UniProtKB/Swiss-Prot annotation:
One of its GO terms (cellular component) is plasma membrane. It comes from Homo sapiens. Its main location: membrane. The lineage of its organism: Eukaryota, Metazoa, Chordata, Craniata, Vertebrata. Isoform 1 is expressed in brain, lung, kidney and colon. Isoform 2 is expressed in placenta, skeletal muscle and kidney. Keywords: Cell membrane, Membrane, Transmembrane, Transmembrane helix. The keyword Secreted does not apply. This is Phospholipid phosphatase-related protein type 5.
Length: 321
């Protein structure tokens, strides 16, 4: 027996909640457990790429994790809620009901207002992308085990015991380090940069939201300034990681690519550039019309047209003669 539309919608909602819960759990295991073993990468004796001074714990950074995570989680929520509320109120004030989404039935008994539905949809996709970015970054750090620029300052290798008579001698193995194991493990997880990826993901998602949603007059200059300001903050976050010797340039660039790719994919392919359901249905309808086969109907000439054609030929012949 086929599922009713309401039951199918309810089933898909539960399925999406399971996917979201699984994504959050996977990010938790990557972030706070030792389930995934970090690849132990070796190094050359006195390698200048890893001899930078230790900049201190992450909390002493110019962009501490608490500040970064708070902004990445709070600013998009505030902007999207304010933006959707403003758009909804503007449509009510101008009585633009054609472009406004309709109230639909969700599940068996729940009627969802379009304002609530759009806000939850966009924030839910953003939250999913935030955890997905964290998973991508942690997976890359675990697999590569790339060393931080200040790795040797934390590793504190005993060069005499290791026999580092030449700079070209390669050292491998965890026993080569004598420093704090927890700090050493963190120094092995730098590629790609998590701070760069999360900051540029939040900035890119918000930039595309502002560009595609805010259509008010007089915002031709305000929108670019706001969007470029968000991207500039993300760019400065990556530069700060390099300036404080916490990441290499390659780590930051890779983090930028991960964050931008996930944001663009979710906005373009999942939320359809923040368009409403009505616009999506119209687009699908036009695509279906374009794909329909063209049927050619033969033209039937009427007797009156035949008589008119004969008279025209006779008149033309008389004029020539």
């Amino acid at each position: 027996m086929p599922l009713l539309p309401a039951a199918l919608t309810s089933s898909m909602l539960y399925f999406q909640m399971v996917i979201m819960a699984g994504t959050v759990m996977l990010a938790y295991y990557f972030e706070y457990t030792d389930t995934f073993t970090v690849n132990v990468q070796g190094f050359f004796c006195h390698d200048s790429a890893y001899r930078k001074p230790y900049p201190g714990p992450e909390d002493s950074s110019a962009v501490p994790p608490v500040l970064l995570y708070s902004l990445a989680a709070g600013v998009p929520v505030l902007v999207i809620i304010v933006g959707e509320t403003a758009v909804f109120c503007l449509q009510l004030a101008t009585r633009d009901f054609e472009n406004q989404e309709k109230t639909i039935l969700t599940g068996d008994c729940c009627y969802i207002n379009p304002l609530v539905r759009r806000t939850v949809r966009f924030l839910g996709i953003y939250t999913f992308g935030l955890f997905a970015t964290d998973i991508f970054v942690n997976a890359g750090q675990v697999v590569t085990g790339n060393l931080a620029p200040h790795f040797l300052a934390l590793c504190k290798p005993n060069y005499t015991a290791l026999g580092c008579q030449q700079y070209t001698q390669f050292i491998s193995g965890e026993e080569a380090c004598t420093g704090n194991p927890d700090l050493i493990m963190r120094a092995r997880k730098t590629f790609p940069s998590k701070e760069a990826a999360l900051s540029v993901y939040a900035a890119m998602y918000l930039t595309m939201y502002i560009t595609n949603t805010i259509k008010a007059k007089g915002t031709r200059l305000a929108k670019p300034v706001l969007c470029l300001g968000l991207m500039c903050l993300a760019f400065l976050t990556g530069l700060n990681r390099v300036a404080e010797y916490r990441n290499h340039w390659s780590d930051v660039i890779a983090g930028f690519l991960v964050g931008i790719s996930i944001a663009v994919f979710l906005v373009v392919c999942v939320v359809n550039n923040f368009k409403g359901r009505q616009a999506e249905n119209e687009h699908i309808h036009m695509d279906n019309l374009a794909q329909m086969p063209m049927i050619s109907i033969p033209r039937v000439e009427s007797p009156l047209e035949k008589v008119t054609s004969v008279q025209n030929h006779i008149t033309a012949f008389a004029e020539v003669t």
